[in-house]
Amino acid sequence: MTISSAHPETEPKWWKEATFYQIYPASFKDSNDDGWGDMKGIASKLEYIKELGADAIWISPFYDSPQDDMGYDIANYEKVWPTYGTNEDCFALIEKTHKLGMKFITDLVINHCSSEHEWFKESRSSKTNPKRDWFFWRPPKGYDAEGKPIPPNNWKSYFGGSAWTFDEKTQEFYLRLFCSTQPDLNWENEDCRKAIYESAVGYWLDHGVDGFRIDVGSLYSKVVGLPDAPVVDKNSTWQSSDPYTLNGPRIHEFHQEMNQFIRNRVKDGREIMTVGEMQHASDETKRLYTSASRHELSELFNFSHTDVGTSPLFRYNLVPFELKDWKIALAELFRYINGTDCWSTIYLENHDQPRSITRFGDDSPKNRVISGKLLSVLLSALTGTLYVYQGQELGQINFKNWPVEKYEDVEIRNNYNAIKEEHGENSEEMKKFLEAIALISRDHARTPMQWSREEPNAGFSGPSAKPWFYLNDSFREGINVEDEIKDPNSVLNFWKEALKFRKAHKDITVYGYDFEFIDLDNKKLFSFTKKYNNKTLFAALNFSSDATDFKIPNDDSSFKLEFGNYPKKEVDASSRTLKPWEGRIYISE
């Protein structure tokens, strides 16, 4: 590859070219039939991940935790949750990952910890404790007519209700933007930051991890004074804290400081990557986070494309959208890096998103496989670091018609209770909420991985075990590893081909630049071009169940059909009509 001086983003890095496979440890593979996935279960399936074509694994939190938010509430950063195994099991997993030629990335959850963490226990023990200022403690704003303390401001928790919890012992509130057992750490306190770096970052660097996925990495810097948020939702007492918590005044300073800690700590020459979950940010802010010269983050996750079709006021309020809206939002993931020294990611699924075929494809029995392959074609052709989530490679779909009682997610339960309290169980608000969770709940991604047709647990646990969460019935319909490996036309086997295609053409697939939409207003067709030196890639993707026409740019005869989701014998490369849910990639040199 020749690096273009006009495109410093094309400087090769292992973490730019790698395909990352995300593992949700509770739901991946149970090795001891206790109903929970574990470290040994992951280790037993590393060859499967390698054969898929992945180059790195990212494991969601496996640390000691009360599991109020599935491990994103950490009680000890230096200990594996015993249900998942021992620290030694984890070190062995890191070693095996490296022996197979893959990298190991772990989740870094340091905006908040668990209320069971020793730091918080000390902090809440008294107002004069040395760690009191490691968290945000504030007296009540006042008391209501019933004598109940009023929270210090009107900030809303991401999980519903107030972002403050009252502590009876010291008669003060503590801030927790998420769950009541996830107190926010005070990054303004230097001693607190040093302890975070040492315990959550340094310990795992010393044990060989290759990078960190940084949870809610845009929330560390809160505006001093924690003022009331502007009222944007007149139907709620509680308002989004984003103006005072998202991409705050010292956020870049904090990331530079942590990046410096990482570079100082690693002595063996390995290059550590960091990917920040940065929610929403302007292009300029994204460039500040990921510019190589600024030493903050390697790359980031943005939510623009996964939030399409949801209200900015409340995620669980669906709004209509068209393909054009999604195309524009998806391109926001990578267009800002063009001609810079920045980098980004591409993904459709993770532990916080539903299944992409249900959300953006067609999960009907007729079109599930072909639309799942279409999404794979799209992802394989986009610029940035590609992330694939467990089960995505199988063409997994959302579960169907579950009552709210079956949902496990604390975000669903807390919002359900908040809506019930504020609007009532039979309200229009509740009806909209239940409609939304059927489409976009995080729980759709969290059902146990489907390894086989074996009843009743699909090979995730032994037949006599009771998994921690219900299974998706789709394992009985062929959506499982064992069936798909045997089926040459399965989504799984297609993903293997897609990742081979991406690697074989990495100059233009991974590093391609100057992305341009073709026929942006088209409601069925997603088509674009991008370049790398003298090469041009042209993609034509039919996001509909109808045959759809397309045009090759400038009728250029040098474009050769390189990849698509229909069998080659069924495709006339000279045809300008796409079959339902057909995607094609052409390259000219």
Swiss-Prot record:
A biological-process GO annotation: sucrose catabolic process
Active-site residue numbers: 215 (nucleophile), 277 (proton donor)
One Pfam entry name: Alpha-amylase
EC numbers on record: 3.2.1.10
GO molecular function, one term: alpha-1,4-glucosidase activity
Positions marked as site (Transition state stabilizer): 352
Principal cellular location given in the protein's record: mitochondrion
Induction of synthesis: Expression is increased in response to the addition of maltose, isomaltose, and alpha-methylglucopyranoside.
InterPro entries given in the database record: Glyco_hydro_13_cat_dom, Glyco_hydro_b, Glycoside_hydrolase_SF, O16G_dom_2
Coiled coil: none
GO CC annotations on file: mitochondrion
Reported effect, residue 216 to T: Can also hydrolyze maltose
Keywords in alphabetical order: Glycosidase, Hydrolase, Maltose metabolism, Mitochondrion
Compartments reported by the entry: Mitochondrion
Domain of life: Eukaryota
Reaction it catalyzes: Hydrolysis of (1->6)-alpha-D-glucosidic linkages in some oligosaccharides produced from starch and glycogen by alpha-amylase, and in isomaltose
Consequence of substituting residue 218 to G: Does not alter substrate specificity
Result when mutating residue 215 to A: Abolishes catalytic activity
Function noted in UniProt: Major isomaltase (alpha-1,6-glucosidase) required for isomaltose utilization. Preferentially hydrolyzes isomaltose, palatinose, and methyl-alpha-glucoside, with little activity towards isomaltotriose or longer oligosaccharides. Does not hydrolyze maltose.
Family stated for the protein in its record: Belongs to the glycosyl hydrolase 13 family.
Note: Present with 752 molecules/cell in log phase SD medium.
PANTHER family documented for this protein: ALPHA-AMYLASE FAMILY MEMBER, NEUTRAL AND BASIC AMINO ACID TRANSPORT PROTEIN RBAT
Protein name: Oligo-1,6-glucosidase IMA1
Organism for this UniProt entry: Saccharomyces cerevisiae (strain ATCC 204508 / S288c)
Higher taxonomy: Eukaryota, Fungi, Dikarya, Ascomycota, Saccharomycotina
